[in-house]
């Protein structure tokens, strides 16, 4: 089989600023470069059949090609995207951003032809141009020549053409791609879109106090995280806006701490006293947020605390709750949503603060999250970080594809949760909806761990005998107290006597649906939801008006609720039986329940049931 024809003259064209060519080249040699603590870098000696050049650098995202021996000496490849970077000493480096191996090294006998080392600045010998060869390289500009007009059009031209930006101080800085930034550069400018901006945060410790905020930015070549401290935080916070494009110049670069971010860059930027941020009006060609989505079905194989990108349809959403952060005693909003993708798996995802308050899941939107942290608390679950980006119905192909899947078939898929319920919700992907007959037939609760399920059922009978007891009045204790018959009540757990007590409820209820019934134990909050009265009022009513007390229980019969229950096989006196406990009891959301019934009918219809 014939070998692909090399693109003779391509090296000259690439160095001359022709960023549109996609030359076919041969790898002559690969040499690793020591980068200290950073990722390995590879320098390539490549040939276009006419010349060789040793100034090719492989972008780090392509390192796996070398590591897996796909990119090796003598192989033939096509460079589909590259960037020319000018060094301080005048040398030029070609950074290979995208590359495809056309012919592996074992199928190529050796070096093709007799290429000569490229001598930058000297005219190269002419070569017959094949049909697929790139256009002739433009002639070198003299010192007094004006740059070609195309150098100011678009991001690619900015990168390849070496255009200059006048900074506020009057100096000039070359616009370079984010992917080429490293700590050894001093004068540079990137043209990038801000995709995420955090709030200003403060800190105080033994070394002092201060403030900071962070942003994430992206251009055609990649993305990077930047942080501004103290004076720079005050200076730039009001200037920088999400989704706007800016010229960023002169920041400090260091090895990135990837523990708290999913940004794909080995370095991160810190603004300093010389940093400048200038708005860019010509921004249409700068990309938006870059995602590397992980399927929900793959989360169980990922390591705990991994920060990753996720996309899913909001199958269900729970109510907002308020929690207090112990570290600063600050109250924040918290909301759990349940996301499902085409894998059929569902994961519980926690939103915080403003994201939690403003989220509307009523229309089951597609939710994309960049930089969510994976937890193993309660199976597998996700939590949004302060550095995360949450997008609702984003304008990206993955969202359109997922929406189409869900509307056509996904809405009738119940979904398998990889997150265990921790109570509080009555709907959604982790609710494990079951009829009471299914609970019995599937032997739920017979395993080593308890099982959870959600069911709509009706109260058939309430056992009011001994459902109220006198408990310790301490806030964190619900132990039954002993009446000392002297006006005091003793709690054995607290080892104290109290002049009062509080009433607590333990209510046994028999519930039923269309196919089965089940005894279930309902504690304080669940029992109060069923009876429609709090325990204190019921205790007083029992003492003063027994008939009114009985009517409360009679009125509660034959009312339907959504029960979230825990079932476990327990053994007592050598007798084993299933014990069901209500985790949560809420009124039936008939709109949601009807939607679920319709989904089940459609599902059975497609299965021919």
From Swiss-Prot:
InterPro entries: Euk_RPA1_DBD_C, NA-bd_OB-fold, NA-bd_OB_tRNA, Rep_factor-A_C, Rep_factor-A_N, REPA_OB_2, Rfa1
A single GO BP: DNA replication
Keyword Zinc-finger: yes
Localization (cell): Nucleus; Nucleus, PML body
Zn finger region (C4-type): 472-494
Record key words, sorted: DNA damage, DNA recombination, DNA repair, DNA replication, DNA-binding, Metal-binding, Nucleus, Zinc, Zinc-finger
Pfam families xref list: Rep-A_N, Rep_fac-A_C, REPA_OB_2, tRNA_anti-codon
GO terms, molecular function: damaged DNA binding; single-stranded DNA binding; single-stranded telomeric DNA binding; zinc ion binding
GO cellular component, one term: PML body
DNA-binding region positions on the chain: 188-272
Top-rank taxon: Eukaryota
Disordered: region residues: 113-163
Ranges annotated as biased composition (Pro residues): 125-137
Family: Belongs to the replication factor A protein 1 family.
Complex formation: Component of the heterotrimeric canonical replication protein A complex (RPA). Interacts with rpain-a.
Annotated function: As part of the heterotrimeric replication protein A complex (RPA/RP-A), binds and stabilizes single-stranded DNA intermediates, that form during DNA replication or upon DNA stress. It prevents their reannealing and in parallel, recruits and activates different proteins and complexes involved in DNA metabolism. Thereby, it plays an essential role both in DNA replication and the cellular response to DNA damage.
The protein's name: Replication protein A 70 kDa DNA-binding subunit
Organism field: Xenopus laevis
């Amino acid at each position: 089989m014939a070998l692909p024809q090399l693109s003779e003259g391509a090296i000259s064209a690439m160095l001359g600023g022709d960023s549109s060519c996609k030359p076919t080249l041969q790898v002559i040699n690969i040499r690793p470069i020591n980068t200290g603590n950073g990722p390995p870098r590879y320098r390539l000696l490549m040939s276009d059949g006419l010349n060789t050049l040793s100034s090719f650098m492989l972008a780090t995202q392509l390192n796996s090609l070398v590591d897996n021996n796909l990119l090796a000496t003598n192989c033939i490849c096509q460079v589909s995207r590259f960037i020319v970077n000018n060094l301080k000493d005048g040398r030029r480096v070609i950074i290979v951003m995208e590359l495809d191996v056309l012919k592996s090294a074992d199928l190529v006998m050796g070096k093709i032809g007799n290429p000569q080392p490229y001598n930058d600045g000297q005219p190269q010998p002419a070569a017959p141009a094949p049909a697929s060869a790139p256009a002739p390289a433009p002639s070198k500009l003299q010192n007094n020549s004006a740059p070609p007009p195309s150098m100011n059009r678009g991001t690619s031209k900015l990168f390849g053409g070496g255009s200059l930006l006048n900074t506020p101080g009057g100096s000039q800085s070359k616009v370079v791609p984010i992917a080429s930034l490293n700590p050894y550069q001093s004068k540079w400018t990137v043209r990038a879109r801000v995709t995420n901006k955090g709030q200003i945060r403060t800190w105080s410790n033994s070394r002092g106090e201060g403030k900071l905020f962070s942003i994430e930015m992206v251009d055609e070549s990649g993305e990077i995280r930047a942080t501004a401290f103290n004076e720079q935080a005050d200076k730039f916070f009001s200037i920088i806006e999400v989704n706007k494009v800016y010229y960023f110049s002169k920041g400090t670069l260091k090895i990135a701490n990837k523990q708290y971010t999913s940004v794909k860059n080995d370095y991160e930027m810190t603004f300093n006293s010389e940093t400048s941020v200038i708005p860019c009006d010509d921004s249409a060609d700068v990309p938006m947020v870059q995602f590397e989505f992980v399927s929900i079905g793959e989360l169980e194989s990922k390591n705990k605390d991994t920060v990753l990108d996720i996309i899913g349809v909001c199958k269900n959403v729970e109510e907002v709750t308020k929690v207090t952060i112990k570290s600063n005693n600050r109250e924040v909003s918290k909301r759990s949503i349940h996301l499902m993708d085409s894998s059929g798996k569902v994961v519980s995802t926690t939103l915080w603060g403003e994201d939690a308050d403003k989220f509307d899941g009523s229309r089951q939107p597609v939710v994309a999250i960049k930089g969510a942290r994976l937890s193993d608390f309660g199976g597998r679950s996700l939590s949004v970080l302060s550095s995360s980006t949450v997008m609702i119905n984003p304008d990206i192909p993955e969202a359109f594809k997922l929406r189409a899947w869900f509307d056509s078939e996904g809405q009738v898929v119940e979904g398998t949760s990889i997150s265990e319920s921790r109570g509080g919700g009555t709907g959604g992907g982790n609710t494990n909806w079951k009829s009471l007959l299914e609970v019995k037939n599937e032997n739920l609760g017979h395993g080593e761990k308890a099982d959870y399920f959600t069911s709509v059922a009706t109260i058939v009978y309430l056992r009011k005998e001994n459902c109220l007891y006198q408990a310790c009045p301490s806030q964190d204790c619900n132990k039954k107290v002993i009446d000392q018959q002297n006006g005091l009540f003793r709690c054995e757990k607290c080892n104290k006597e109290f002049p009062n007590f509080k009433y607590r409820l333990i209510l046994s209820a028999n519930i039923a649906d269309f196919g089965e019934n089940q005894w279930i134990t309902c504690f304080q909050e669940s029992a109060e939801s069923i009876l429609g009265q709090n325990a204190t009022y019921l205790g007083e009513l029992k003492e003063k008006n027994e008939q009114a007390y009985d009517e409360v229980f009679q009125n509660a019969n034959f009312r339907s609720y959504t029960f979230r229950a825990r079932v476990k096989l327990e053994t007592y006196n050598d007798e084993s039986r299933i014990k069901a406990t209500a985790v949560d009891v809420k009124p039936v959301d008939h709109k949601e329940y009807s939607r679920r019934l319709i989904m089940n009918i459609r599902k059975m219809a497609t299965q021919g049931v």
